[in-house]
Design a protein with these regions (language model features):
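Beta1/beta-strand and adjacent pyrophosphate-binding region of the FAD-binding site
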Residues: 2-16, 32, 193
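Acidic-histidine catalytic/liganding microenvironments
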Residues: 81
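Non-heme iron-sulfur electron-transfer modules
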Residues: 6, 37-73, 87-117, 129-167, ...
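Gly/Ala-rich phosphate-binding loop of Rossmann-like dinucleotide-binding domains
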Residues: 21, 25
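Glycine-rich Rossmann-fold phosphate-binding loop(s) that bind the pyrophosphate
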Residues: 12-16, 121, 168, 197
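Conserved S-adenosyl-L-methionine
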Residues: 26-30
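Short glycine/serine/threonine-rich phosphate/pyrophosphate-binding segments
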Residues: 17-20, 170-173
Length: 200
């Protein structure tokens, strides 16, 4: 891997955003990958396994650079790259500056479930009294107010839909690791510097 040469902000963690983040990280940039959704992969995350081979939907979308299939790598596993920081439920509010030196202002929704402590056991979802249409399955099934947004989520933790949650606290009581905390801060706003050292 090359020496770090600057930083980059990739807005949108769909398939093209993920691929861009991985390419920039391999070039040596420190990458902030943000998405306003609570999960990665965009629409492609709904195509978890594809017929007829059951290959991963994300990996099937990779361009084949060489004839040797080993030139491809798993997009999900690649996101654990040391140069990539993932910020979900985050949106770009403002962008100021000039080429090579930008200041980005980001706003992040509160995290009710701590992804570092959530084990993905599903106990919380089992006691949630709220049921709503599941967007992941195009409204054909139901989900709870606390739910796993997509299979193989990165990080593999549950999220709370504050628009439908009644704040009853049942999930917080049953969580075996204490990962759920409804005493959240309001939306956090912060600024990051996006720099290309070669242009400065």
């Amino acid at each position: 891997m090359r020496k770090k040469i600057g930083s980059a902000l990739v807005v949108g963690a769909g398939i093209s955003g993920i691929r861009s983040a991985l390419d920039l990280a391999e070039l040596g940039y420190q990458v902030q990958l943000i998405d306003r959704a609570p999960h990665l992969g965009g629409t492609l995350s709904q195509l978890d396994y594809q017929f007829p081979t059951d290959h991963c939907g994300m990996c099937k979308m990779l361009p084949l650079v060489e004839r040797d299939s080993s030139s491809q790598y798993c997009l999900r596993k690649g996101l654990f790259h040391e140069n990539i920081e993932i910020m979900l439920s985050t949106e770009l509010v403002a962008l100021e500056g000039e080429p090579g030196k930008f200041q980005a202002t980001l706003r992040q929704k509160p995290a009710i479930v701590d992804p570092e402590r959530c084990t993905g056991c599903g106990e919380c979802s089992g006691v949630c009294p709220v049921e709503v249409a599941d967007e992941f399955n195009a409204g054909l099934t139901k989900r709870k107010a606390i739910y796993l947004p997509v299979p193989h989520n990165i990080p593999n933790s549950y999220t709370v839909d504050l628009a439908t949650c009644t704040l009853c606290g049942e999930c917080e009581k049953i969580c075996p690791t204490g990962a759920i905390d409804f005493r959240w801060e309001a939306r956090k706003e912060f600024r990051i510097l996006v720099v290309d050292d070669e242009l400065i």
